Amino acid sequence: MSQVNMRDMLKAGVHFGHQTRYWNPKMGKYIFGARNKIHIINLEKTLPMFNEALTFVERLASGKNKILFVGTKRSAGKIVAEEAARCGSPYVDHRWLGGMLTNFKTIRQSIKRLRELEVQAEDGTFAKLTKKEALMRTRDLEKLDRSLGGIKDMGGLPDALFVIDVDHERIAITEANKLGIPVIGVVDTNSSPEGVDYIIPGNDDAIRAIQLYMGSMADAVIRGRNNVAGGTDVFVEEAPAAAAVEG
């Protein structure tokens, strides 16, 4: 199991929080102190919590479960899409549509429409339409792809959410909480950790920090899937007990 170390976090600026006047008291126990009116996050607390979250994700992936990556703010979107694609995971990088989880039946219909338009764009249907109609369908396709392209292959509800900036993605977290879907979240000093099952106290704005979180999570998914492909059982400690029962 590959883990993140303190040096990685320091280089990425994970320890830099927000201005002290914007702090959320619920994050007090994760704050080391302040420097130039900026809160400094205690990485001795962040490090084990992040590695615990990575272990959880690796175990989920080894069971062929789906982790939905969510990061829709400008600094996160591109990295979220790239790393999710690298590990073959679903993602939301543009805007969280209300009901994406709690009203998945309706979302599924929109995904079906997206697929129909993709087929029409490829099979020459658009070319047979009037210019106006072709333009309207192209715009529909682009709009649906921007909103739902990252989850079109998800197939059903995810088994966990990984969220960059829990305040920005509060609607997604609330929906996951309602459905009992575990939430892993990067929580900065100005945010509330409520509703987050695996808290990662850290900078949620710096691009290098976001790259570290997302790259590490994608690697954990890939490791978990490789465990399945290679026949490795990450729950190997349970195997003897199971064998004894069968015997």
Swiss-Prot record:
Family indicated by similarity: Belongs to the universal ribosomal protein uS2 family.
Gene: rpsB
Entry-linked HAMAP family: Ribosomal_uS2_B
One Pfam family it belongs to: Ribosomal_S2
InterPro entries for the chain: Ribosomal_uS2, Ribosomal_uS2_bac/mit/plastid, Ribosomal_uS2_CS, Ribosomal_uS2_flav_dom_sf
Protein name from the UniProt record: Small ribosomal subunit protein uS2
GO biological process: translation
Ribosomal protein recorded as keyword: yes
Cellular component GO terms, alphabetical: cytosolic small ribosomal subunit
Organism listed in the record: Pseudomonas syringae pv. tomato (strain ATCC BAA-871 / DC3000)
Any GO MF annotation of the entry: structural constituent of ribosome
Annotated keywords: Ribonucleoprotein, Ribosomal protein
Top-rank lineage group of the source organism: Bacteria
